[in-house]
């Protein structure tokens, strides 16, 4: 009986880990070899677990959504508190990040993926508020993607 419970627990953990890995397979959703830099004003920010969404309006009128997932995984007040105060309506920010892949590219890896894909979604590498010292950036990657030939 005890062995059966241990086996069931191991199966559950393996299944949960693979599901979480598929959901957070960053390279399948964002093209890490094609970064863009955009500058615009914050229209709104939504702190929703497990993602934080920043909605920007660029000077040319284009609307962008920034999927700031790393922030929402850091749930201590030292990180979220300043970010909530820094990214208020009207704040001008510069975001450098990776643009989301097309629906066809995502379905190459996840054939049953059915969500809509907003082509103006960016996964940030860095965010800087214009005019003062607020900034945030991911640490350098230990194993950066190989972008040769892309």
Model feature map: region roles:
Residues 138-150:
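Glycine- and charge-enriched low-complexity intrinsically disordered segments
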Residues 76-95:
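Short nucleic-acid-contacting surface segments enriched for D/E, G, S/T with interspersed K/R
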Residues 20-36:
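Short boundary/loop segments of OB/S1/cold-shock single-stranded nucleic-acid-binding domains
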Residues 40-42:
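Conserved hydrophobic positions within beta-strands
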């Amino acid at each position: 009986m005890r062995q059966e419970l241990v086996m069931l627990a191991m199966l559950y953990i393996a299944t949960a880990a693979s599901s979480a890995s598929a959901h957070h397979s960053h390279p399948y959703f964002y093209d890490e070899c094609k970064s863009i830099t955009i500058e615009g004003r914050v229209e709104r920010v939504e702190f929703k677990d497990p993602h934080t969404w920043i909605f920007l309006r660029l000077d040319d009128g284009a609307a962008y959504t920034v999927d700031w997932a790393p922030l929402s995984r850091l749930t201590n007040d030292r990180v979220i508190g300043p970010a909530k105060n820094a990214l208020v309506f009207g704040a001008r920010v510069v975001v450098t990040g990776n643009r989301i892949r097309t629906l066809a590219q995502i379905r190459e890896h996840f054939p049953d993926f059915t969500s809509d894909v907003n082509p103006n979604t960016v996964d940030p590498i860095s965010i800087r508020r214009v005019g003062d010292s607020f900034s945030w950036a991911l640490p350098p990657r230990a194993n950066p993607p190989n972008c040769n030939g892309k």
